[in-house]
């Protein structure tokens, strides 16, 4: 097994476990795998070669060693590591398969949708002032954006940090995770009991053997019994620590699930009105009583003064108000007074513009008088009647 494969495996286990599970994984790697591989091999490498009995009977020494150690300590611990880690590895394989299947299904759905547009309604923001297309624009308009851009915005938003439990629940892996946790705990308890019945808590310096083919009771001696006893107690402690971590993780999952359910119920009680209003797909519109402003026809540019342009704009605005406004019978008194003042101001503005045009265009008035004079020559009866009355006519 290469280190790169082990590194990838550990990264995946970290991504799909709680923080207590990550602590358990650290204990498994550091105190079990490394300690067994480094310390166990160096301590127990001469376990059988240094097992010496005070007899010359052929085969007696091998029989006594088999009675002393039915299973080697190192092989027992290696077998324990493999069986305890098997549920986690199986859970990891199932989790990777399920998540990959979910991602493949989501990718197919996105490809089938072919990036549909998400629509939302937004305020107009005074775009009418810059457009000159002679068209009526609504006060509300749909804003288009790509579905992918919307998803990227959602992903960029900061998500609340959690300990991995919520991610396991969101991926639908909670039952499998609890099942592998229970299996791991059962294996820990089984190996802890088996280690006690096989080796006890101490490695004795000698062993009395009376099995056949030994002719009588003989004494066999073990190398470095104190060192092996200390290492045996360390492995007991590591097994107990892993068992406590498993129990802690089960309690963490149970209390965390209960806390999440209580928090969700509390949020529902605090915000009961979130589900009282039915959702409709009606097109949004302006508030009641709000009139859509229609653009007037574009005024052709002439050489009129600014006063004449302002007059025409005011006249168009008044026409729009009369067209889309309420009836005069339903208007309040203040609004009627305001309209009368607007009409009076309009009349004054008309007189001012006429006087301004008469003052600035005297040549045009003389041409008009000449044309009227030619008309008067053709119609002598009307001219003589006006001259006979002695009245002068003023042409504006």
From Swiss-Prot:
Residue numbers spanned by region Disordered: 146-165, 356-396
Cellular localization per UniProt: Cell membrane; Cell junction, Gap junction
PROSITE patterns registered for this protein in UniProt: CONNEXINS_1 (PS00407), CONNEXINS_2 (PS00408)
Major localization listed first in the record, in broad terms: membrane
Keyword Membrane: yes
Compositional bias annotation for Low complexity: 373-396
InterPro entries on file: Connexin (IPR000500), Connexin45 (IPR002265), Connexin_CCC (IPR019570), Connexin_CS (IPR017990), Connexin_N (IPR013092), Connexin_N_sf (IPR038359)
Extracellular side: 46-75, 199-228
GO annotation, biological process: cardiac muscle tissue development; cell development; cell-cell signaling; chemical synaptic transmission; gap junction assembly; vasculogenesis; visual perception
Bilayer topology term: Multi-pass membrane protein
Keywords per UniProt: Cell junction, Cell membrane, Gap junction, Membrane, Transmembrane, Transmembrane helix
Molecular function terms from GO: gap junction channel activity; gap junction channel activity involved in AV node cell-bundle of His cell electrical coupling; monoatomic ion channel activity
A GO CC term attached to the entry: connexin complex
TM region(s), chain numbering: 23-45, 76-95, 176-198, 229-248
Cytoplasmic domain ranges by topology: 1-22, 96-175, 249-396
Keyword set includes Transmembrane helix: yes
Skewed-composition ranges (Basic and acidic residues): 147-156
Function: One gap junction consists of a cluster of closely packed pairs of transmembrane channels, the connexons, through which materials of low MW diffuse from one cell to a neighboring cell.
Similarity field: Belongs to the connexin family. Gamma-type subfamily.
Subunit structure: A connexon is composed of a hexamer of connexins. Interacts with CNST.
PANTHER family according to UniProt: CONNEXIN, GAP JUNCTION GAMMA-1 PROTEIN
Protein name: Gap junction gamma-1 protein
The encoding gene: GJC1
């Amino acid at each position: 097994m290469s280190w790169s494969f082990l590194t990838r495996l550990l990264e995946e286990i970290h991504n799909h476990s709680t923080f207590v599970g990550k602590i358990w994984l650290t204990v498994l790697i550091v105190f079990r795998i490394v300690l067994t591989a480094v310390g166990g091999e160096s301590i127990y490498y001469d376990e059988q070669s240094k097992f010496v009995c005070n007899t010359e009977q052929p085969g007696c020494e091998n029989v006594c060693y088999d009675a002393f150690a039915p299973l080697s300590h190192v092989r027992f611990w290696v077998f324990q590591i493999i069986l305890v880690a098997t549920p986690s590895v199986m859970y990891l394989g199932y989790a990777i398969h399920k998540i990959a299947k979910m991602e493949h299904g989501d990718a197919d759905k996105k490809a089938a949708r072919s990036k549909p547009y998400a629509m939302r309604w937004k305020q107009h923001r005074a775009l009418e002032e810059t457009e000159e297309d002679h068209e009526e624009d609504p006060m509300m308009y749909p804003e288009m954006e790509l579905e992918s851009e919307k998803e990227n915005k959602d992903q960029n938003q900061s998500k609340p940090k959690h300990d991995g439990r919520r991610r396991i629940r969101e991926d639908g892996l909670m039952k499998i995770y609890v099942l592998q946790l229970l299996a791991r705990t059962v294996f820990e308890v089984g190996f802890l009991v088996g280690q006690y019945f096989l080796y006890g808590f101490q490695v004795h310096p000698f062993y009395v053997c009376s099995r056949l083919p030994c002719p009588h009771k003989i004494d066999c001696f073990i190398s470095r019994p104190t060192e092996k006893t200390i290492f045996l107690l360390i492995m007991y402690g590591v097994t107990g620590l892993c068992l406590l971590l498993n129990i802690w993780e089960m309690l963490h999952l149970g209390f965390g699930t209960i806390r999440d359910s209580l928090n969700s119920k509390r949020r529902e009680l605090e915000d009961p009105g979130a589900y009282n209003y039915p959702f409709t797909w009606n097109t949004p519109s302006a508030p009641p009583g709000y009139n859509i402003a229609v653009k007037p026809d574009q005024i052709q540019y002439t050489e009129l003064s600014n006063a004449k342009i302002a007059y025409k704009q005011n006249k168009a605005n008044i026409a729009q108000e009369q067209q889309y406004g309420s009836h005069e019978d339903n208007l309040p008194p203040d609004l009627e007074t305001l309209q009368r003042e607007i009409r009076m101001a309009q009349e004054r503005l008309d007189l001012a513009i006429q006087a301004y045009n008469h003052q600035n265009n005297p040549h045009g008035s003389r041409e008009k008088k000449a044309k009227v004079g030619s008309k008067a020559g053709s119609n002598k009866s009307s001219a003589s009647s006006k001259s006979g009355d002695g009245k002068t006519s003023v042409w504006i």
